[in-house]
UniProtKB/Swiss-Prot annotation:
Main location: cytoplasm
Keywords: Cytoplasm, DNA-binding, Methylation
Family of the protein in this entry: Belongs to the 7 kDa DNA-binding/endoribonuclease P2 family.
UniProt key word Amino-acid biosynthesis: no
Protein location: Cytoplasm
Subunit structure: Monomer.
A Gene Ontology term for the protein's cellular component: cytoplasm
N6-methyllysine found at: 5, 7, 61, 63-64
Name of the molecule in the record: DNA-binding protein 7d
Gene: sso7d
Highest taxon listed in the record's lineage: Archaea
Length: 64
């Protein structure tokens, strides 16, 4: 499975694509929420050019 690498509040993070719940576009950034485990939801964003193709595919599916 693919992973998404991003920075959130100055901290480098990496999350598996399978844990991502919701994806949306904000300008040239792709924002998302993901399951952190223990009932917590995390969020992150990555630039469109750095986003893995699986994340972009999820975005297209949610538009429909």
């Amino acid at each position: 499975m693919a992973t998404v690498k991003f920075k959130y509040k100055g901290e480098e993070k990496e999350v598996d694509i399978s844990k991502i719940k919701k994806v949306w576009r904000v300008g040239k950034m792709i924002s998302f929420t993901y399951d952190e485990g223990g009932g917590k939801t995390g969020r992150g964003a990555v630039s469109e050019k750095d986003a893995p193709k699986e994340l972009l595919q999820m975005l297209e599916k949610q538009k429909k």
